């Protein structure tokens, strides 16, 4: 459900001032009949604790924790499921935002390398190529920027087929960093195209206090 916010990069380095992200979140998933399924709630992330926390209140009240390589789901304060997730929280869009790495999708500090740059009108399109590694699951990534703002990301598999396209819109300038408040994502899996729109509202950077809300304690014997 929330994997859209993460991919696979290997990012290091930190922005000195920003360490916490909090926002209301709405996820719209387009169904085959053209209607949308809505999920509404909030999201929190502290890069020191490295846990992405989602609280939903619609269509039902649920709580999700993305930690390490797991996603835990809670209903009525009870752990109901644990799923593997190869995309760690420190590889999420929230981490990129706090590091001020979002303009290049975190690729500058990854093991990808620039292999081509094109300029078309007011867009700069940068082609990032993956390392030479037969086990690496992804191919090239095209990143489009306008006035140093991330506009879109196009992710391919090793065969050159499109896996995912993301469009970033409605930027706000908060605490010295550019933050998109709307992301359109189109995924292509097994020949099926799926659409998601992710919207952030009431974005806060560096909320003070409330440490327990960012560092949710997980009972090890429950995993």
Spell out what each predicted region is.
Residues 1-20:
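Bacterial Sec-dependent N-terminal signal peptides
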Residues 16-36, 52-53:
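A short, Trp-centered hydrophobic/proline-enriched beta-strand micro-motif
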Residues 16-19, 27, 74-138, 214-222:
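Flexible, processing/modification-adjacent segments and terminal tails
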Residues 27, 56-57, 74-78, 154-158, ...:
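Beta-turn initiation residues at beta-strand->coil junctions
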Residues 46-96:
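An acidic-aromatic
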Residues 121-214:
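Gly/Pro-enriched, hydrophobic low-complexity segments
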